[in-house]
């Protein structure tokens, strides 16, 4: 899916992966007890920041990458009826490789 949000500089738009609804033993987890998700799929990537020499520094992630990001990083936004997270590239901790 292509998002019509174009992030600026080193920002990334992420679609969060939903938190588990039940435990391995089948217990339902109430919304108040769920942890904030830290995984998501990259939907859009900015062009990168400009370094001190005026060169553009490309980002290490691409659209479609599954990433793990800082628990409290980013800003939640609603666009086109969908919830997204816009965060800085430095808030991305790792790319999940399968």
UniProtKB/Swiss-Prot annotation:
Please indicate which superkingdom the organism of origin belongs to.
Bacteria
**GO CC term, one of those recorded:** cytoplasm
Where does this chain mainly localize? cytoplasm
Q: What keywords are annotated for this sequence in UniProt? A: Chaperone, Cytoplasm
Keyword Mitochondrion carried by entry: no
**Record-annotated disulphide pairs:** none
Q: Where does this polypeptide localize?
A: Cytoplasm
GO molecular function annotations of the record: ATP binding; metal ion binding; protein folding chaperone; protein-folding chaperone binding; unfolded protein binding
Q: What is the stated purpose of this protein? A: Together with the chaperonin GroEL, plays an essential role in assisting protein folding. The GroEL-GroES system forms a nano-cage that allows encapsulation of the non-native substrate proteins and provides a physical environment optimized to promote and accelerate protein folding. GroES binds to the apical surface of the GroEL ring, thereby capping the opening of the GroEL channel.
What family is this protein classified in?
Answer: Belongs to the GroES chaperonin family.
Quaternary arrangement and interactors, per the entry? Answer: Heptamer of 7 subunits arranged in a ring. Interacts with the chaperonin GroEL.
Protein name in UniProt: Co-chaperonin GroES
Annotated organism of origin: Leifsonia xyli subsp. xyli (strain CTCB07)
Query: What is this organism's lineage?
Result: Bacteria, Bacillati, Actinomycetota, Actinomycetes, Micrococcales
